[in-house]
A protein has these predicted regions:
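Glycine- and acidic residue-enriched flexible segments with recurrent GG/GxG motifs
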Residues: 1-205
Length: 205
């Protein structure tokens, strides 16, 4: 369940602004910063690997399996959403060995069937945005973290998956499985509406 607490804002230098006044939001992604529980991880996930945007040692690192060839670096979770509803999906992502990342949906039969958008984690810029996503944003925080967000609208199929992926370049989905391809992630969120509100930690249902 979501933790109910006042939303706190920080600037790029991680200095406290104060309590935010913003719409109430529910984070629909359970275990939203514990990517080892209920998430499909491709590769090796190390929990509590790095300092997260909130200053705690709670950010995760995902690195490829080292199996050779090409494949994915991914944390993906199954979701059940409402039909014909607009959602904002967001996550905090930081470059590690990989300097690109993308957020994607899949397994929906209509609406955002398989749709992705890419960001450059070195320059803080938006790359390719596929049909199904809108209002894509990347906001720089302290210590090279970015909050990345985008908006989707569901169709009649409400069951699908949302994933955070590492990438080697814009508009590419596969990485070299050499044991070094990695990104840092924290604070995934899915909420109704058109705005990424302050991150709400979640745990069990």
């Amino acid at each position: 369940a979501a933790v109910i607490a006042p939303a706190i804002s920080y600037d790029r230098a991680n200095s406290l602004y104060g309590i935010l006044s913003e719409p109430a939001a529910t984070n629909l992604l359970l275990y939203s910063r514990d990517f080892s529980t209920g998430w499909q991880d491709s590769g090796t996930l190390t929990a509590n690997y790095a300092v997260a945007p909130d200053g705690t040692q709670s950010a995760a690192r995902i690195v490829d399996s080292g199996a050779g060839g090409t494949g994915y670096v991914i944390a993906r979770r199954a979701v059940t959403l409402a039909a014909s509803t607009t959602y904002t999906i967001s996550a905090y992502i930081k470059q590690d060995q990989l300097t690109y990342a993308y957020i994607g949906t899949d397994s929906f039969t209509d609406g955002p069937i398989t749709a992705r958008f890419w960001v450059n984690l070195a320059s803080g810029t938006i790359g390719t945005v596929q049909t199904g996503w809108s209002n894509v944003s990347i906001v720089g925080l302290s210590d090279d973290w970015y909050r990345v967000s985008g908006q989707i609208t569901t169709g009649s199929d409400t069951a699908g998956r949302i994933g955070i992926f590492g990438a080697e370049a814009d508009n590419t989905v596969l990485v070299n499985l050499d044991g070094t391809s990695s990104i840092l992630i924290w604070g995934a969120q899915a909420e109704t509406g058109t705005v990424a509100t302050s991150y709400v930690p979640t745990y069990a249902a």
